[in-house]
């Protein structure tokens, strides 16, 4: 605010650089952030997520993508990094209640719309598979 370089600003810069670097290693040309952006798009159906930046929701989506791809080791490492940089590692951090079935079904349906980039992933996608991936992220983030 006053031309000072604060620790909070440094933390944000570190998170952006670290997050961007990790994203590049998550998949091949078409899958790097395929699910991450689709998850962002799905979350936008809930008005309470409007206050969160695009990148914040994509960051959570990266965790879901790792879960979908069965990358448990990567998921564990990313959860630790997200927690260190105060990025959302749980849906609650985005003010989303995974136990609200009606609300969460809307997120899943929107995430899985035809044409969403999540369909580039080399996995069979169903609402149940995607829900399990979200649940896995929540489990790893405890």
Where are these regions (language model features)?
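Active-site segments that bind and position negatively charged phosphate/pyrophosphate groups
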Residues: 1-81
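C-terminal charged capping/lid subdomain of soluble metabolic enzymes
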Residues: 72-142
């Amino acid at each position: 605010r006053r031309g000072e370089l604060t620790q909070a600003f440094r933390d944000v810069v570190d998170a952006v650089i670290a997050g961007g670097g990790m994203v590049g290693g998550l998949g091949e040309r078409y899958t790097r952030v395929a699910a991450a952006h689709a998850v962002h798009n799905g979350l936008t159906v809930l008005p309470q997520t409007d206050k969160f930046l695009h990148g914040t929701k994509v960051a959570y989506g990266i965790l879901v993508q790792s879960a979908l791809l069965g990358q448990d080791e990567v998921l564990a490492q990313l959860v630790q990094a997200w927690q260190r940089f105060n990025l959302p590692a749980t849906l609650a951090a985005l003010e989303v209640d995974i136990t609200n079935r009606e609300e969460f079904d809307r997120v899943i349906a929107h995430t899985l719309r035809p044409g969403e980039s999540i369909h580039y992933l080399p996995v069979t996608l169903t609402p149940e598979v995607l829900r399990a991936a979200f649940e896995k992220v929540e489990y790893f983030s405890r």
